[in-house]
Structures are given as C-alpha cells and as structure tokens.
C-alpha cells in the first residue's frame, strides 16, 4: 500500500482514515485533528513498551528452554523447577488480600448469571443474531436439536411433526415445574392463565385455580388481565416469557393455549476481533470496525434470505410489559433489554497490522489500534440521538473490552495504562473502559491474583480458556519432553487446578456480585443433548457465565442457570482455594512412550485433519471461526485456539522424536484428501490434495506444525496472517 494519509509520525491507510473521520467520529463531539494527534502520541509512547513486553516473553521462554534442555535426560525435582521460575521472575509473589473496586457496571455482568456468546465481528449476520439472542424460543431450541430424541415417531422431518411437538411441550412444562413451580400440581395440568387480584392464576381441568409457589416470580404480562397474551416470570434473575395464543398453530394443540416459552438467553455477547476472525489488513479491520459501529449505533442491518424470502434483519428493540406490581416510582410498565449486553474482544499484544505504519514503514501494534478505535466507536453505545443511533449498549456508561493473550501482571498493567491513555484521547472519565481478563496463558494463571490486582478498578471478567491455555502449557515446556495425547489433557492435574483456582481467586478478590467469572466454549455444535447434560457443571462450579456457540445453544444453556443458583454456589465456595501452584506446575508429560504405532498415527491424523480443516477456510475464505468436521465427521466449532493446541502438540512430538517430519507430511497428504471430500459440496472450495505444493493453505498448515516450536508462545497468527496476505495477493482478493 503506497497511498497513505500522513498524520504526524503515522501513515494511515485511506480506508481506515476515511472511515474514522466520516463514520466513527461524527456524533462523538471529538475533533478529528485532536483525535488523530492523540492517536499519534499514544502510539509513539506505548509502542516501545509493547515491544519490551514481547521481548520479555521471548527472554523468559529462552531461559525455560535452556533449563529443560539441561535436564531432559535426568529429569528434575518439582521444587527446583518452582524455585527456578521464581528466580527468573516468571512466578511472582502473590499480593495480599484485596477486593476489586470496579464501579459503573451493568447488571448483566454483576448480578445476572447466564450464557455468553462469542461471535466473529466480520460477519454482520452472525453479529446481529448474537445481539438479538438475549431472548430465545425454548420450543424452537428443543424441536430443532437432538435434546428431543427421534424415538417413537418424533423425527424432525421437513414439516411440523406433532409427535415431536408434543415432546417439546412436555419438556418445556417440566422445565417450568422446576424453575417456576406452581403452589400445587404441574404446569402440565393447566388449561389457562389469567390474573386474579394482581396475582398469576393458572386454571385447572376442574375449573379451579392455583397460583405460583413463589408469587413474586410473576413480574409482568401483556394483553388483558383476564386473558393475557404473554406472562413474564423470573427465576434466579433470568426471565421466562410464556406466550399464549390458542389460535396459533402450536397454541391450538395445547390445552392451555400456550404457543411458546421464551427464555432470556444470551445475557452478554463478545463481539470478537481476535481468535474467531481472519483480519489481516486495513480492509478487514475496517469491515469489523464498521460492524461494531452499527451495533453501537443500533442501525446495523443485513439482508437475509430464508425459506425463499428476503428480509432485513435489524437489532431488536427493548421489551415492555405491564408490571405485575408498580415500581418504586409508581411506574406501571416494566421494560427489559431486548438485546445482549455487548463486549468487544480486542487482539492481544503480539500482532501488528498494516492499517497504520510509522514514519519508517513499521506496522504498529494491532492491540493499540483496537483499543483506540473500538473505544471510540463504543461511545455511540453510551448515547442515543442524532449521530448516535436509537439504541444504547451500556446503561451505566461503560465500554467493555475483553483483552486476550496477556502473560502476567505487567501485561495487564500495560493494558490498563493503554486504556487510561485512550480515555484521555476520547475525553472519557477514567475507568470508563472496563477490561475482561482471559486467563488463557500460563504466566497469567500462575499469577492470577496479581493480574487482577493490576486491573482492580477496571476488571469485569475473568474467563478460563482450556485450548489456548493448553497450547501455552505445551509451548512453555516444549523442551521438557513429549506431552500426553491431546484428548488426555482435559483429565490432567493442572487443568483441574486451573479451572478451580480461577473461580476461587475470583471469589477471593470480590467478583461475586461485581464481575463475571466465566468458563469456556461447548464446541460440539450439533450435540446439544450432550451439552444440556454436561454444561451444567460450569454453573455448578461457580461460573456466572460460560461460552456457547450459537443462539440456540444459549437458550438451552440458560436452563442450567434456572436449575443452579450460582450466587448460592459462591457462598458455599467462599474462603476456599482448591488449586495450588504445585498442581499448576505439574507439566503434562507422558510418563512413558508406550503408545502403539497405530495410536501415534491416529493422534497425528486427528490433529493434521483438524489443522487442515480449519486452516483451509482461514487462508482461502478468510473465515476465522466455523463448524469444522473432525476426522469422524463430528462438527466442531473451531477458532485459532484449537489450531494452537493441535499444532503445538505435533511440534512437541517432532521435537522429541515421537514422530518424524515425514510422518507429518504423509499424514497431511492423507488428510488433505479427507478434508477435500468433507468440503466437496462447497462450490468455492479449492481442493488441496491434487496439488499440495501449490496450495497456500496446505503449505500454511504444514508450516504451522514443522515450525511450531519456533513460534512466539506457540501462536499461530504470524503464519496465518502472512499466508492469508499471500493468498489475497495471488487471488486479487480485496
């Protein structure tokens, strides 16, 4: 790119400069020259600090590599290892007890436990669907997934199957019995709903009525009191809307005329600029920034074709009901948010992007760019009116930013300093920008309490990320010896300690009722029955939120937060610390290399297939998050985190002679044919197997494995970005 706009010491891509000046700045009351001058100063002051932190990562890794190489034969004592990490500053002293002081945070984060979506910001349709997933039909979620079995003639089919529909209704009634029980009997027995002297009354077959076991769970309704069209209930802070219409197709089959049960579902959503997107240049970044602007202004729209019809999808409005009881101010209406509360995930400290270069042509850190531009855009989510759009995101004046891939408290402190400088540029009060800390790197896990302390007045979220965290676990100890197989990682000692410690330190530092404690993604997008059975373990473990791959999954996962009162779990866990540093330092090394040749081949093939299936869409289609069938054709929601663990495991096995370079190359060639076949129905797919040497995607996958041990902290972004740019240049893709 040769044509750039000069801004002080910076050279800005015209597509970005024009977007900021013509679209993002109007409505913020910020002068363009003042803004760009501030950008120039922040970049000049903080880029060297960013580079120093990355150099510190490399230095620590080099010291750890040397330490392990000196002991790879004789092994080492855990206490010696722990002392070494302390001596080099990798393991830092834990601070004295404290509580976070974050203020001005929305209820969705502080006092509401529920599902969290993560979606790629480059896809406007996905972003709209996620923002609108605050409310979801339980009937649809059940009918369209394997939560309802096909047994007894209940197959989904192409048209409505009343046998399946009856199963859905029965399941929903059982859910209501658990979440909002009647004073006696079952929701399955009712024939109607009405108000009786301001209280909800359910009519029964014999003409009698029964109220709720806890009358306060009734909070609002729509329509006439004698024949409401909707009834609003609440349990554990989450709302349930029962829709009534005896003439609707489903309501007509229900003796109570109930046509649907709608659950408050995706309470919060992360709009992602990081692991789920392929944004490698100025054009990609501006596409994401423009979608983020539309979400904050409330005017994002997308043409959608469904069932042979085309319509425009927009953001949902808030929902207003007649209140069951007048509010403190005498208000007779109850208004609830119609949309998920939005976070934005910036990129980490590692990557740069050519959207802005300095006077010498060096790309500037992408994380600094994201902080400046996503925060500027976030101002629109704090206001309504001319220039800001009709909707707000935060009702408390905060902009929520998830910051990933931070290594230790110094990097968290740097993020907070960056946010403070951005607030100065934007004229925002200090601590407007809140931070979500991803606990997904080993040095952050080991120093989690110190990381939280570094952001004590900004932090609104800590979250475990098993895949990235495992990738860093492997890379940090790359030279210690061969690691166990990928599937065995979830049952290791350090993983259990990691998941428990995150909750315990969150509670210890005052997160309950003030900030989110989150847990990771359910990746098997089509296996919703398994999710409903298993994912309840996360709220039971104290998580106030956990990641889901779709709006449907959000609605199903919401049921878990009705069954589990997470804040009661917090009271039970308070004062405990279940994970120890010694457990966290237990490296997942294979005790002995007792794998049979076919087991090794299976592991290599599984990982190579996973890598190719993800990378080919990343490189050729610019898709950073998608359902990728595994070697057994089970659809998995994959992003860069899954790629990191797979490539790092194979790099580790290569390092220690478990496999050879030729084993990897042969597996990649075999698996390329498998991935080609899995994508055969896609007319735009470019097969890899016929010419692997000519496939940039294939070469990228191979490089990720063969060069995996040399990648900074095992990250995949440097290779992916370079190869995607190569593909775009070769294909004239904009």
UniProtKB/Swiss-Prot annotation:
Keyword set includes Magnesium: yes
Keywords for this protein: Cytoplasm, Glyoxylate bypass, Magnesium, Metal-binding, Oxidation, Transferase, Tricarboxylic acid cycle
Pathway annotation: Carbohydrate metabolism; glyoxylate cycle; (S)-malate from isocitrate: step 2/2
Main location group: cytoplasm
Residues involved in glyoxylate binding: 345, 440, 465-468
Annotated Mg(2+) binding sites: 440, 468
GO biological process: glyoxylate catabolic process; glyoxylate cycle; tricarboxylic acid cycle
Cysteine sulfenic acid (-SOH) carried by residues: 625
Enzyme class: transferase
Subcellular localization: Cytoplasm
Catalysed conversion reaction: glyoxylate + acetyl-CoA + H2O = (S)-malate + CoA + H(+)
Role: Involved in the glycolate utilization. Catalyzes the condensation and subsequent hydrolysis of acetyl-coenzyme A (acetyl-CoA) and glyoxylate to form malate and CoA.
Family: Belongs to the malate synthase family. GlcB subfamily.
Full protein name: Malate synthase G
Natural source organism: Mycolicibacterium vanbaalenii (strain DSM 7251 / JCM 13017 / BCRC 16820 / KCTC 9966 / NRRL B-24157 / PYR-1)
